[in-house]
Curated annotation (Swiss-Prot):
<dbReference type="InterPro" id="IPR040442">
    <property type="entry name" value="Pyrv_kinase-like_dom_sf"/>
</dbReference>
<dbReference type="Pfam" id="PF02548">
    <property type="entry name" value="Pantoate_transf"/>
</dbReference>
<feature type="active site" description="Proton acceptor">
    <location>
        <position position="189"/>
    </location>
</feature>
<keyword id="KW-0460">Magnesium</keyword>
<feature type="binding site">
    <location>
        <position position="92"/>
    </location>
    <ligand>
        <name>3-methyl-2-oxobutanoate</name>
    </ligand>
</feature>
<feature type="binding site">
    <location>
        <begin position="53"/>
        <end position="54"/>
    </location>
    <ligand>
        <name>3-methyl-2-oxobutanoate</name>
    </ligand>
</feature>
<dbReference type="GO" id="GO:0005737">
    <property type="term" value="C:cytoplasm"/>
</dbReference>
<feature type="binding site">
    <location>
        <position position="122"/>
    </location>
    <ligand>
        <name>Mg(2+)</name>
    </ligand>
</feature>
<protein>
    <recommendedName>
        <fullName>3-methyl-2-oxobutanoate hydroxymethyltransferase 2</fullName>
        <ecNumber>2.1.2.11</ecNumber>
    </recommendedName>
</protein>
<keyword id="KW-0566">Pantothenate biosynthesis</keyword>
<dbReference type="GO" id="GO:0003864">
    <property type="term" value="F:3-methyl-2-oxobutanoate hydroxymethyltransferase activity"/>
</dbReference>
<dbReference type="InterPro" id="IPR003700">
    <property type="entry name" value="Pantoate_hydroxy_MeTrfase"/>
</dbReference>
<keyword id="KW-0963">Cytoplasm</keyword>
<dbReference type="GO" id="GO:0015940">
    <property type="term" value="P:pantothenate biosynthetic process"/>
</dbReference>
<comment type="subunit">
    <text>Homodecamer; pentamer of dimers.</text>
</comment>
<feature type="binding site">
    <location>
        <position position="53"/>
    </location>
    <ligand>
        <name>Mg(2+)</name>
    </ligand>
</feature>
<dbReference type="GO" id="GO:0000287">
    <property type="term" value="F:magnesium ion binding"/>
</dbReference>
């Protein structure tokens, strides 16, 4: 059995994401951890596959993403890459692997050698030097601001960010700083819709939202969440796309359509 894709679909590249943003075409992104789903998601039209440290939750059973190692992410990145998807492959830098610019570069090199085409790291203003260091060394970067799950203990839980005047001002500073440092994509998690919209219109680079409103340049969900595979209470920003669909591919295609036509997220999935 082979998972190699034979597709005439043009490859999604970092410049392509910018072109999509500039043309007003929404970007559909999902997490992915293995070759089988890499092939299926690519067939279904997903633009970006994220090997997220969310694997610590949905695959390893941890309550936070903190235990996930760089080796874990590299292993799953290699699995996803073996299917040779046309979608862009983005990989998370786990907690504790980018404390200095040099450490971030070494970690990024390992993930890019495994097949990643872009790395994602969590943080705002304080990461500007690191982002600049990576971009100068040909490492494409997605900066993750707002609710950053690796900071769960500092936040005191998984809480919406930017609800206060001071918090909103900090989010705007973070977004400006990471773009100025060279981040090619900014991911916004769990922020009020108005803030997501303001950041999206303020920046030139694409924004990807998860609980950040419909105005973002694109959307991302954890694969297991959008397929209805989650224990306990469903996060507000999640929609179960398996409902009413005959199979997983149909559910993923429904997600892609909903992102592309702007019907997801709705107000019920936003803050």
């Amino acid at each position: 059995m082979t998972y190699l894709q034979e597709s005439s679909r043009p490859a999604v590249t970092v410049p392509k994401l910018q072109a999509m943003r500039d043309a007003g075409e929404k970007i559909a992104m999902l997490t992915c951890y293995d070759a089988s789903f890499s092939a299926l998601l690519d067939r279904s039209g997903v633009d970006v596959l994220l090997i997220g440290d969310s694997l610590g939750n949905v695959l390893q059973g941890h309550t936070t993403t903190l235990p996930v190692s760089l080796d874990d992410i590299a292993y799953h990145t290699a699995c996803v890459a073996r299917a040779q998807p046309r979608a862009l492959i983005m990989a998370d830098l786990p907690f504790g692997t980018y404390g200095t610019p040099a450490e971030a570069f070494a970690s990024s090199v390992k993930l890019m050698r495994a097949g990643a085409q872009m790395v994602k790291l969590e943080g705002g203003e304080w990461l500007a030097e690191t982002i600049r260091f990576l971009v100068e060394r040909a490492v494409p970067v997605c900066a993750h601001v707002g609710l950053t799950p690796q900071s769960v203990h500092a936040f005191g839980g998984f809480k919406v960010q930017g609800k206060t005047e001071a918090g909103a001002a900090q989010l705007l500073r973070d977004a400006r700083a990471v773009e100025a440092a060279g981040a090619q994509v900014v991911l916004l998690e769990a922020v009020p819709t108005l803030i997501g919209s303001e950041v999206t219109h303020m920046l030139r680079v694409p924004t990807i939202g998860i609980g950040a409103g419909a105005d973002c340049s694109g959307q991302v969900l954890v694969l297991h969440d959008m397929l209805g595979v989650f224990p306990g209470k469903r996060p507000r920003f999640v929609k179960d796309f398996m409902q009413g669909e005959p199979n997983i591919q149909a559910a993923v295609e429904a997600y892609v359509r909903a992102v592309k036509d702007g019907s997801f997220p709705g107000p019920e999935h936003s803050f």
